[in-house]
C-alpha cells in the first residue's frame, strides 16, 4: 500500500518515462516472442489433460462452459496489426524525402511574390508561376509514387485466408459444425484429411493422421500425428497439431490447448507485425543528398544576401535575392527522374521474375552483402527425386532423363527387375488423372513425397506402373507406421498363377534385420558378415550425401501354404515377416535447381555471402550446400577436420575451419557474442534444424555485423525474418500469402538465380542514378550564375525564371531518364557490395564535378551567347555594367546604347527576352555534351558506344523541344520566348566540345593512374 500511495508524488514518473516504458514493454514482449515456444501440454497424460482443461475426453465441453470461455478469451482469430491509413501513406509520398525541398521552395516563392506585390505597383509574376509549378511537380510525382506502391503491404489479410472457416467439435457428446472463430480452449475437435487445423490441438486419438507443417517448420515431408509424447520440443513432438497447418491424410481427435493469438502461428503473426522496419538504403541516400544540396543553396543564398546589402540594395530586395538563389538551387525535375528510374527498373525486374513491391527496395537489393536463403524450394526443386540405388553390391546413379539416355547400369539385371517391382507395388502413390501428355517428372501425384519419387523413377525406367499393379493385384497391406518403420503388401504373382509375393520397404536397418538372404545377380545367397558390411558402407555413403535411403526386400510365398484366395490377416499376422530376401537400397534427394550453383558463384564473385538457413537435417543441408557451392570445394567444417585427423571435434581450432554447420539446438544456447563470432570468422555457413524465431535471430546477427541482409522464405515461419531483413524475398509459387505480404520482393519463379539478376539490376540502377543526378545538377550552375551577375554587376537579367523551368521540367527530363537505360560499364557483379557508410549516391566529388567544373564551362557558354546578342543590338559589355536600374525603369523610354541609339522600355524587354531564349538554347547545346559524358564514370564514351537508343532519342527530343519553344508562333506572348537567328545557336558549340574533350581527358587519366589524385578528387 505504502509504495502505491507514494507513487503519486514521485516527480520522476513523467510522461517521457512512460513513453520509454511502453517501448521497453514492447521490446520485452518481442524478446519473449523470439524465445522458443514454451508449453507442457504434450507431456501430460490424458487424465491430467482432462483435469487441466476441465473437459470430459469423450463428451467434450458443455455448451454453457464453452460460452463462458469464449466470453473470457475472445474469438479464435488473429488480431489484425495496426495498418497505416491510406491518407497517411499518400501524405508520406507528398511530404517525404525529396518533396520537402520542393515544398520549401514553393513556399519561399509565394513569400517573395507577396513581398513584391506589397511593394511594387506592377509586380512581375515570375515567382508566383514558379511556386505553382513547384507545388504541381510535387503533387503529380507524389500521386505517381503512391499509385506505384498502392499495390502492396497488407500483412495480415493473408493470414485471414489461412484461417479455417468451419470446425467439427464434440460438445455434450454430440458432433457439431461451428465457425472456427467460436472454438475455445478445452474443446474436443475432430480433423480429417483435407481439413485445416482450427487451433493448437493436443492429439488424444488418431488413425493414420499426417499433417503438413511445412508452412510452420519448413519440413517438406508430411509429419505423422499420434497421441504419444515423442519429443521434448513441442514443435517436434507427434501429439501436437498446429493452428492453420493442413491435415493431409487420416483422422484425429484432439483437445484445443490454445486459440487465436496464443497459438504458435499467432505468435509468429504478432512477431512479424511488431517488428520495427529500418529505412531503406536509398531513402538514406536521398536524405544525405538533400542535406548537401540545401547546404550549397543556403551557403550561396546567405553569401549573396550579405553581398547585396554591402552593394547598397535595400533589405527587401536582398531578401528577394536570397529566396531567388535558394529556389534556383532546387532541381525541380530530379524528384520525377528518380521515381521514373526506379519504376523502370522495377518493370525490368518483373520481366526477369522479380516482382518488387515498393520502389526503394529496387536499389536495396543492389547493396545487399549477405543473403540468407531457405533451402527447400529456393535452392532446391522441392521435388523428391530418386538419386542412387544399391543392388548387386554396386551403387548406381539413377537415370531421371525422359528418354532414359543416361542409363548407368544394365536394365536387364534380374535384381533390378525385382527392385523395380517392389518399388512399384509396395507404393501407394498414383498419378492424378488426365496427365498423359505431360512429361513424367512434371506430373502431379497423389501421395507422399518419397513414394511419388519412386513412382516417377519406376514409371520412367520400366513403363506404366499402373499396368504393373494391374498384373500383380494387391491382396493385403500394412501401411507404414512409425513404430515398426516399414510398409508391406502382398500381391498375386503375374508369373505364377498360384502363388503370392510379399514385398516390403522401409528404414534400411529395420528391413535388413528381417532378412536372412540377399539377391545378387538374380540368385539368393545367404546374408553373411561380408554382405552386411557392404550394405553398411553403401548406406553410410548414400546417407552422407544427404539422401533419404529406403531398403527393399521380398519373399515368394509358397503356393502350398498360401494358395490363391487365402485370407491374409494383417492384424493377427498369419504369414511370415522374417527371413526375407534383401534386394537393394534406393535413395532420394530434393535436388538443387539447375541454375543455382552458377548463381551462388556469381554471388561469391560479387562479394555477397550466401548463408543457408533450413529446418532440414544437418547432413542433408550440408550435402545440398556442397552441391550448390555454398560450401565450396576443399573447404572443411570442424567435423571434417576432426574426421580427417582422427581426433575429437573438441580438439580442433574452430578458426581453421572456413565452413561451418550450426545445429538449431546449439544456436538456442548461444549468446549473441558467440553467434557474432561464428558469422565473423566463417565465410561459409549453414544453419540446420532451425526454428522460425532463430531465423530472425540470424538476420539480426548479420545486421549487427553491418551487413545489408536479404532473406528468402516461403513459409509463414519466415515472415518475421522477411520483415526484419533489409529486403525480404518471398516465393511466388510455393510461398504462403503471409510471407508474400511481409516481403519487399516476390520471386515469381521461386528460383534463387533470379535474386542474382535482381542484385545486378539493383547495382546498375545505383550507378545510373548517380549519372542522372550528375547530369541534372550540372545545369544548375548556368541557371544560378545569371542571377548572381544580375545582382553583382547590375546587368540586365540574362536568364528568366520561366526559361529555367523550361530546362528543368522540359528539355532535361527525357535525357535524365534515358540514363536509366544505360548499360553497365564493367562487370558489375565482379565488385564488392557498396559500403553504405562511404559509397554515397551523391558525394562531394559529384557536386564539385557538376557545379565546379562542367557547370562553369556551361555558364561561360551561356554568357558568351548573351553578350554576343546584346553587342549585335548595340549594347557592348562595357555599357551593360551598372545599367540595370535604368534598364528596368518603365518610365525611361530613351535609354542610349553604345552607339547612341535610343531604346524604349518595350524594345529593351524584347531584346532581353530574346537573350533569355538564346541562353536557354545554349544550355541545351552544352547539355548535349554533358549527357554524353555522363554515360560513363570511368570508361571512354568510345569504349561504351552509343547503343542506348533512348538516350539518342533524348538528345533529339530536347533539341526539338528547344526549337519549338523558340520558333512556335504565340510563344512571345505565352512564355516570352522569341525566335533566334540560326547563328546564335552555334555560339555555345565550342563550349560543348570543350566539355566533351575535358571529360575524356579526365577519364583517360583516371584509367591510367587508378587511385591517383584525379580519382580521389573527381571520381564520383
Swiss-Prot record:
EC assignment: 7.2.2.13
Region named Interaction with phosphoinositide-3 kinase: 80-82
Active-site residue numbers: 374
Catalytic activity, as annotated: K(+)(out) + Na(+)(in) + ATP + H2O = K(+)(in) + Na(+)(out) + ADP + phosphate + H(+)
Subunit structure: The sodium/potassium-transporting ATPase is composed of a catalytic alpha subunit, an auxiliary non-catalytic beta subunit and an additional regulatory subunit. Interacts with regulatory subunit FXYD1.
SMART domains: Cation_ATPase_N (SM00831)
Record topological domains on the Cytoplasmic side: 6-85, 151-286, 337-769, 821-840, 936-948, 1004-1020
Region (Disordered): 1-31, 212-231
Record-given protein name: Sodium/potassium-transporting ATPase subunit alpha-2
Predominant location category: membrane
Transmembrane residue ranges: 86-106, 130-150, 287-306, 319-336, 770-789, 800-820, 841-863, 916-935, 949-967, 983-1003
Pfam families: Cation_ATPase, Cation_ATPase_C, Cation_ATPase_N, E1-E2_ATPase, Hydrolase
GO cellular component assignments: cell projection; plasma membrane; sodium:potassium-exchanging ATPase complex
Top enzyme class: translocase
Gene (name only): ATP1A2
Propeptide: 1-5
Cellular localisation: Membrane; Cell membrane
Modification Phosphoserine, positions: 10, 439, 450, 559, 587, 672, 826, 940
Residues annotated to bind Mg(2+): 714, 718
